[in-house]
Every structure is written in structure tokens, then in C-alpha cells.
Design a protein with these regions (language model features):
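Short polar catalytic/cofactor-binding loops
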Residues: 7-13
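C-terminal beta-strand edge segments of enzyme domains
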Residues: 132-134, 196-264
Length: 264
């Protein structure tokens, strides 16, 4: 299976331009025979909102919105699975969401659970459980940017059978890329972090998108700056074995009776 990410710099508020640019990256990924490509968080709108009017203007319904409809058409025509960060409107609420657009045109939505900084002003926290989505070649879990700070997220997704964690991001802090090495091996999963780059309204983003294997190997990575699509070949079943040594299994060795304080 070939998996990848797009790293680029959206222009705030320029939804049509951002979508057209991403479609060019996706076409390049298709030329490399990609099966799955992850886009950054809020890829079509930009990130640094300054008013609810901006949120209202730039948000859209999923899957009825123009961004999702365009990506559905592309996914179906190119046998591609896409995970895209979108500013979602649901009646009078707004969410920082990720849409999984499957190659058959089906759409699933995850809403960011752990809102970062001023996102708490604009968005409602996610109201849906951490779910695993079955595609034709792999089982996918989704988290968005700051969700990574909470190790329970990846652990729950891994326990539910996710082989690949899709991680659309707009990272500003410098920790995530290193932390995902540990998260991948601690849960024996692939993690694709698709980060944006550049500066927007005074906020600098860290770039350095990457794909990490269950054994901590970095299979692909980008620099802090620069726009590109990267695709690598993986075997998702590498994430199925939780065996660490002859005597140790990641799931069997858990002592859940001692973990109850995590729920307090």
C-alpha cells in the first residue's frame, strides 16, 4: 500500500485557490500510485481566524460543501483515499474537522476533540468517538493536530485496530515530530503527520511533515519550509503484531486494573 501526505502553505481565506493547489499535489501523488494521502488541518481555509464572521464565511457542510464534493469526485476518479482538514459547519455550530473521503466516494467525519489555544473561541469540541475506518487496504484512525498531546487518543485507536493514524496538523510547537516516534513504537502503528508550512497572520508553523513506522523508522519527512507531496510503500499488517519479545505482548501485558485513575 502506498501512503503519503501533502505539505503546503495555504493562503488564508482563499478556499478556491487552496483547493486548486492541493488538487495539483494530489495528481502528483496519484502518479506515484498513492492509495492514501493526508492533507493538513484546515487546509482549504487557513488557520488563524480573527472573528466569528470569518469562521461563518469560510465554513462549509460536510459532505455537501464544495471542498468535499470536489475531493469526492477526485477520489472516485483516481481510486484514492483522502483525509482532509476542513472547517465544518453543522447548523449553528462549527468544528475543526477531518473528512475521510474513501475511494468509493463515502465520507466519514472526525471532529477535533482537544482544541488548541484560540480554537476554543471559534470551534465546538468534537462530539464523536475515536473511530477506526476500514478501507480496501488498511484500517485508519484519525486525530487532528493537538490531539497528539493526549496519548489516550492513539492508544484507543490502536486498541480498536487502527493500523495507520492519519494526523492532519497545523503545528506551531516544536515537540510533535519527535514525540510521534515514541507514539508509533508504543502503539505499533504507522503515523502520518501532514503539517502546513509558512507564516500566517504572524503565526509560524513548523512544517516537517513525516511518516513514521511502528518500529520508529522515519519513512518520509519534509523540511520546515517547502511544499511537496511524499509517498512511500508500506505493509499495513506490520502494525498488527503487538509482540515485543518472546515473553512480551503490548496488549496482553497491560495492567488495566491499575489504570483506573486515568478516568478521574
Amino acid at each position: 500500500m502506498k501512503i503519503g501526505y501533502v505539505q503546503f502553505q495555504p493562503q488564508f481565506g482563499e478556499k478556491e485557490k487552496n483547493l486548486k493547489r492541493v488538487l495539483r499535489f494530489l495528481k502528483n501523488g496519484v502518479q506515484e500510485e498513492a492509495d492514501l494521502i493526508i492533507l493538513p488541518e484546515l487546509f482549504n481555509t487557513g488557520y488563524v481566524f480573527r472573528s466569528m464572521k470569518e469562521v461563518e464565511k469560510l465554513s462549509e457542510h460536510i459532505p455537501e460543501g464544495e471542498t468535499t464534493k470536489t475531493l469526492i469526485h477526485f477520489a472516485e476518479n483516481n481510486s484514492l483515499n483522502i483525509v482532509a482538514g476542513i472547517c465544518e459547519r453543522d447548523e449553528d455550530r462549527f468544528f475543526n474537522s477531518a473528512a475521510l473521503i474513501s475511494s468509493d466516494g463515502n465520507v466519514s467525519v472526525y471532529r477535533k476533540t482537544h482544541l488548541f489555544y484560540k480554537e476554543k473561541i471559534w470551534f465546538s469540541p468534537g462530539d464523536r468517538p475515536f473511530s477506526v475506518y476500514e478501507t480496501e487496504k488498511a484500517r485508519l484512525g484519525i486525530m487532528i493536530c493537538f490531539d497528539w498531546f493526549f496519548p489516550e487518543v492513539i492508544r484507543i485507536l490502536a486498541l480498536k485496530g487502527a493500523q495507520i493514524i492519519c494526523h492532519p496538523s497545523n503545528l506551531m510547537l516544536p515537540y510533535c515530530q519527535t514525540a510521534m516516534l515514541g507514539a508509533a513504537v508504543q502503539n505499533r502503528v504507522f503515523i502520518i503527520t501532514a503539517n502546513r508550512t509558512g507564516t500566517e497572520r504572524g503565526v509560524k508553523f513548523t512544517g516537517k511533515s513525516q511518516i513514521v513506522a511502528p518500529d520508529m523508522r522515519v519513512l518520509a519527512s519534509s523540511r520546515r519550509s517547502g511544499e511537496e507531496v511524499k509517498v512511500v510503500d508500506v505493509n499495513p499488517s506490520d502494525a498488527d503484531s503487538k509482540r515485543i519479545t518472546e515473553y512480551n505482548d503490548l496488549w496482553d501485558d497491560r495492567r488495566t486494573e491499575l489504570y483506573k485513575s486515568l478516568l478521574n
